[in-house]
């Protein structure tokens, strides 16, 4: 089959080489965007008098036929035509004849593919933003139901201080809020039209780039044609933002995996988000959480792959840039699906509040409360720290906890300790008293929830 760019060539191509160079197997995902870009381009060509109105009408009609066929799944693509751009041009030629050749006036595949990617990513990121907003709403709802659910707070995966489970959930709400802000802020760098940059240097035709950008819903055009076709930093930024987002999902998934284990039993995932074992009948595995954790590495790989593709490219377009799409497509699908799966897990999981709180009774996470108690009575904190540390050692040797120590022994340890110490050492009291701004105290949690709701 004759190639659309074959005028300069005499030798025949070979199918196996065509297959290696073709991108239609994956860039056909952008068929809708490619057709939209072509419709805007032909309208601009007619407006500027570069093609006649009748030619524009024929081309437009042909493109709309292709849009209808695409919606019905009736378009067939070929590796002989390499990519989505040449495939559509060939299909258009079959629909309307030689006038289809005028569509590519004042346009290169270089600005065409860049335009397609900007359009595709803009719409896909908007969908991810909506999924992320939904997840944030789910977290707020779950936190609101667990303000007074007490759990161990951890450092080094060791019990540190008791906290509200809502406080833990709202910590991730803050992380996902920053993820949302990064994605929303990045849209202005995606929402730029490279169309009209042509191959690299612009065109000799009197085009109106602002008009085609307006038709496509872009907010701006690239100010430099070379920049417009050469860079993929808008994709790298998306991949970077996605990597941070997936990292946050992965951290939470790691905790869910731990919490669902027999050793913790803090939460239970519904059957829909769990799987069994082919040999062990009792198993209920948190596979969806594990998959999100695993897919995080995949998204990281897409980021590093894209950075590596670009790091040595001289301006302007190089065929290496064909490798910019699969990682972007994969990341978009992975992030979107992961967000929806994760939101479903959180929304439906059962919280074992009694087990969580009981866990705080069998540790020394209230040791800081005793040290603070002494400090508030005038004992220098470092001295109080030393006193409590020695008492913890003594308790571990005797197999008891701070709340089990006899009051008479507390007075031997320090005469300023009074009988209210047992109330101070209670987990719920310890949590409630941490009412500094941003703390885990119940009053602060209600403030945080109110603030969070304002941002939903």
UniProtKB/Swiss-Prot annotation:
InterPro entries: Arg_succ_lyase_C, Argininosuccinate_lyase, Fumarase/histidase_N, Fumarate_lyase_CS, Fumarate_lyase_fam, Fumarate_lyase_N, L-Aspartase-like
Keywords: Amino-acid biosynthesis, Arginine biosynthesis, Cytoplasm, Lyase
Gene source species: Listeria innocua serovar 6a (strain ATCC BAA-680 / CLIP 11262)
Name of the featured protein: Argininosuccinate lyase
Family: Belongs to the lyase 1 family. Argininosuccinate lyase subfamily.
Signal peptide (from-to): none
CDD domains named in the record: Argininosuccinate_lyase (cd01359)
Subcellular localization(s) per the UniProt record: Cytoplasm
Example GO biological process: arginine biosynthetic process via ornithine
Gene that produces this protein: argH
GO MF assignments: argininosuccinate lyase activity
